[in-house]
């Protein structure tokens, strides 16, 4: 885990562990593994769950690893298949909370953007995109020089960059498990 070696991790967890090892969001996965390692180093203990199963509990919050450690024929191993569903459920829940935070941040950024006029528009106009065109302020984010007021999405973009996300070049990648886009009208349903 410390080396972020996905291949070895998949081997350790057994066949059909792709959903356990990878969510499809490489940055979030690497950060989650690093958080787990840090929690493990802080504190870890094995909690017996009967005579043939244990749960690894880590960190100050006593986070239980959803993948049980089981005994079979006198050997102990991580049962990736048994823990896969629970890990995916936890990942989905975590990503949904992140998506809610992103949507709230989006609303805050749009309200901030609309509170002032940009590129000749009067106040009250919302941004139609996240990233502004070069030299423009027609999106929620534009680069600013030192001493200039930050763009409405500047703090969120800085936070995402600090987490390890990079500007999209080519194939889109999820942000905390989700893809986001601007909608300009209500759909048929």
Name the predicted role of every residue range:
Residues 14-65, 166-188:
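Surface-exposed, charged secondary-structure patches
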Residues 13-16, 116-189:
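Extracellular/periplasmic head regions of type IV pilus-like filament subunits
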Residues 53-97, 104:
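Short beta-strand edge/turn micro-motifs at domain boundaries
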Residues 1-10, 84-137:
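Conserved hydrophobic/amphipathic alpha-helical signal-anchor segments
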Residues 9, 56, 78, 106, ...:
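Generic structural hydrophobic/aromatic packing signal, biased to beta-strands
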Residues 5, 74, 176-178:
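Loop/turn elements at helix/coil->beta-strand transitions in domains of secreted/extracellular proteins
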Residues 5, 24-25, 151:
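Intrinsic-disorder/low-complexity, polar/charged segments
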């Amino acid at each position: 885990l410390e080396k972020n070696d996905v291949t070895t991790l998949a081997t350790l967890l057994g066949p059909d562990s792709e959903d356990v090892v990878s969510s499809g969001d490489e940055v979030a996965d690497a950060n989650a593994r690093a958080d787990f390692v840090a929690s493990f180093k802080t504190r870890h203990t094995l909690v017996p769950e009967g005579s043939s199963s244990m749960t690894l509990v880590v960190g100050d919050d006593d986070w239980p690893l959803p993948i049980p450690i089981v005994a079979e024929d006198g050997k102990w191993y991580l049962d990736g298949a048994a823990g896969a569903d629970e890990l995916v459920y936890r990942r989905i829940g975590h990503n949904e909370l992140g998506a809610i935070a992103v949507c709230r941040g989006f609303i805050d950024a749009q309200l901030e953007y609309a509170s002032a006029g940009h590129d000749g528009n009067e106040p009250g106009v919302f941004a139609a995109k996240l990233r502004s065109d070069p030299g423009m302020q027609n999106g929620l984010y534009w680069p600013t020089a030192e001493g200039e007021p930050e763009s409405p999405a500047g703090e969120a973009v800085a936070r995402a960059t600090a987490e390890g996300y990079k500007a999209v070049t080519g194939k889109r990648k999820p942000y905390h498990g989700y893809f986001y886009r601007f909608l300009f009208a209500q759909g048929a349903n």
